[in-house]
Amino acid sequence: MRLSGARFALLHGSRATGRARPDSDIDVAAWWSGLAPASFEVDLPAGVDLVVLNGAPLELAGRIAVHGQLLYDDDPPCRVRWVATTRKIYFDEQPRMLRAQREFAEALRRGR
């Protein structure tokens, strides 16, 4: 990822939270300055899944900003800005996201 220009990377998912099983993949998230590649364009070993943070949905990016573990950081001011901004928006929007999830689950339960 570094060779492709990622400024920082975070471990997330089950390996970051300590709930990994032996067959769990490795979930990594990275941020690029400028034009970010698609996740499939970055050459990674088998078993490593990449989230490109530049375009990640808020629910996913927010969980990564809150629970991710830093793997490397070539641009600390950029990382701090991304984490702070993403966490703020995530926590501000969390009540709306939870309400939407409840309404969706209720609609499924009612068969609509």
Language model segments and positions:
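Catalytic core of pol beta-like nucleotidyltransferases
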Residues: 1-8, 16-22, 31-112
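Short, well-ordered beta-strand segments
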Residues: 27-29
